[in-house]
Amino acid sequence: MPKTNRAQPGRLSSRFWRLLGASTEKNRSRSLTLVTDSSEYDDEAAGLTDEQLRKAAGLLNLEDLAESEDIPQFLAIAREAAERATGLRPFDVQLLGALRMLAGDVIEMATGEGKTLAGAIAAAGYALAGRHVHVVTINDYLARRDAEWMGPLIEAMGLTVGWITAESSSEERRAAYGCDVTYASVNEIGFDVLRDQLVTDVADLVSPNPDVALIDEADSVLVDEALVPLVLAGTTHRETPRLEIIKLVGELEAGTDYDTDADSRNVHLTDVGARKVEKALGGIDLYSEEHVGTTLTEVNVALHAHVLLQRDVHYIVRDDAVHLINASRGRIAQLQRWPDGLQAAVEAKEGIETTETGEVLDTITVQALINRYATVCGMTGTALAAGEQLRQFYKLGVSPIPPNKPNIREDEADRVYITAAAKNDAIVEHIIEVHETGQPVLVGTRDVAESEELHERLLRRGVPAVVLNAKNDAEEAQVIAEAGKFGVVTVSTQMAGRGTDIRLGGSDEADHDRVAELGGLHVVGTGRHHTERLDNQLRGRAGRQGDPGSSVFFSSWEDDVVAANLDRNKLPMETDPETGDGRIVSPKAAGLLDHAQRVAEGRMLDVHANTWRYNQLIAQQRAIIVDRRNTLLRTATAREELAELAPKRYRELAEEIPEERLETICRHIMLYHLDRGWADHLAYLADIRESIHLRALGRQNPLDEFHRLAVDAFASLAADAIEAAQQTFETANVLEDEPGLDLSKLARPTSTWTYMVNDNPLSDDTLSTLSLPGVFR
């Protein structure tokens, strides 16, 4: 059984760091020196009273964090404050991590090394320098937990701290954002930014100007969810996709009426299927100019929902509703939905009443949201593997932080099998073998269906396993906390951002030594993910803080990452005839898996870059609208412009309406038409994005065409909004019972709501190519 100890980030060469977007050895060495120097002030800090410690923190000169001579004193004060407030005395490596975040890096710290404490110290450092800090988490639970946990430390240094969740009121949000340090999920920060684009009075604004974003699970937020659009919608009447098409597609036969590609990421009608659909819809021509951008798109979207999106893999059904599963986190993607047609098609497929999304009033991607901040830094257990994306899209460096104690986890080379069935049998036998020793086992699966199937098999074999997936994620913290207990077998979907350490011997570590003697936590992966980062997040659950641990991944030539990225005809098929278990004996197997994973990562980077090019223009246009809106909201520009455009009408109204009231009326009119124009523009962009890839048929570059159409449409937006505002100003009736104008026709949505759009449900660029395959007949 060959075992390999994976290289730790701290041992990588400087050249390798730079290739991965890591910060230079020189910068890291300076930070190490500052940490060492801070120990000279430890005794002095320990001798201060709580009040003196608070005052000492306030006297620090940290305005220029890169050059401040007070950094060692700050670290000593932070170490002492942490111990008093939380009972945790930071290790040198945690102070090093905090310093690298204060330098604007994303740090890589292994699971269990204390990222949360390092992040709180960095947040305090920025706040003491006069900055406003948003600690960005991946969910509400972690935002509240970390704020309550680390709040006493931040307050011990004379600073204020607040937190925001989905339940927070506008007043609570405003108060939390007013604190020096604010903990909130990326969703809630984004939704507040969007909702602020509807206010017509400065006093109603909630979200402040962005300053510092310190991001927990930075690779998950900045890479995995970078292109997820956050959406603000309002009530309106919109037609849902035709149910007759959804029903018709459900009756088509695989292999005859439609085909899928090798990795089941694209589906298209065959000639036979196209003719069947055309006949059922009254003899239309799907590929005519009349139907190619409408009916054909509806058919392809319905086909996508029926064939490619699988229940308990891509979504679950709970309480008569479809809930998307976040593949990178293994849990329900709260508030997420697919684009309108696809969401309705999946709901119809499951026999659920289709939900209304309303009209999109504003939208922003997570990437655009984060890029608003003047300073971005963060922390995660797997930053180096995301270094290229962090550098390319955010200009961020990565600092690997060595563990406090050497990592002694043993990682076995992959066990590779010819078929998935042989692999699954081997996984069950392996878990039973390890379980019989009492060593705790954590099994990481790739989706809900796989986790439940494996769980059932283990129960049938007498193994009392517990399962954690999107269906029971409310039990998450308790299940994970006990996963290191003697004899426990835990089957879980993706481990990213679980937020709870697995301690040997259970949450109270009562059996720590007994479990350690058995080898610590044993991690089993049921297959490679499409990115090494997710594999490493699972591996990293074992061997925390110098504890023993081990890991092994089981793979097969039928796994998705292999089928999509390697030529099956070139794969070694030699097995051991004596065992007859279907396990590949070729030493090349593990290397081929690595290659398949690198190809998959390259494809995902291409998708990210391509989608970013589309979103970048929208983000630029949105920034222009936001700037114009802020000007109208905060100044007298609306009144001045309407007075210039309609001087006669303005003079007439000025004689009847007080100046302050007239200014408010002008502002409401201008803001309404600007918001109306932006919403219409977003709807137009969504429409052209749906069919833009058809431009390739005319040998046009889809991206260039999208940019041309979007720029042309945007060019007239501001002028049209001003013209519409002028018309309203000149024609609105004067109210009889009070000074003012009748603006009842400028009705805003009676209700609004927010959600996220999963634009790439298969982690591929499938949606943008839905209309292409069936076009070539």
From Swiss-Prot:
GO CC field: cell envelope Sec protein transport complex; cytosol; plasma membrane
Protein name according to UniProt: Protein translocase subunit SecA
Organism: Mycobacterium avium (strain 104)
Compartments, as annotated in UniProt: Cell membrane; Cytoplasm
UniProt cross-references to InterPro entries, sorted A to Z: Helicase_ATP-bd, Helicase_C-like, P-loop_NTPase, SecA, SecA_Actinobact-type, SecA_CS, SecA_DEAD, SecA_motor_DEAD
EC number: 7.4.2.8
Binding locations of ATP: Q94, G112, E113, G114, K115, T116, D501
Family: Belongs to the SecA family.
Lineage, top ranks: Bacteria, Bacillati, Actinomycetota, Actinomycetes, Mycobacteriales
GO molecular function, one term: ATP binding
Topology in the lipid bilayer: Peripheral membrane protein
Record flagged with keyword Lyase: no
Note: This Mycobacterium is unusual in only having an intact secA2 gene. The secA1 gene, which is essential in MYCS2, is annotated as a pseudogene in this organism (MAV_4203).
Source superkingdom: Bacteria
Cited function: Part of the Sec protein translocase complex. Interacts with the SecYEG preprotein conducting channel. Has a central role in coupling the hydrolysis of ATP to the transfer of proteins into and across the cell membrane, serving as an ATP-driven molecular motor driving the stepwise translocation of polypeptide chains across the membrane.
Subunit record text: Monomer and homodimer. Part of the essential Sec protein translocation apparatus which comprises SecA, SecYEG and auxiliary proteins SecDF. Other proteins may also be involved.
Record GO biological process: intracellular protein transmembrane transport; protein import; protein targeting; protein transport by the Sec complex
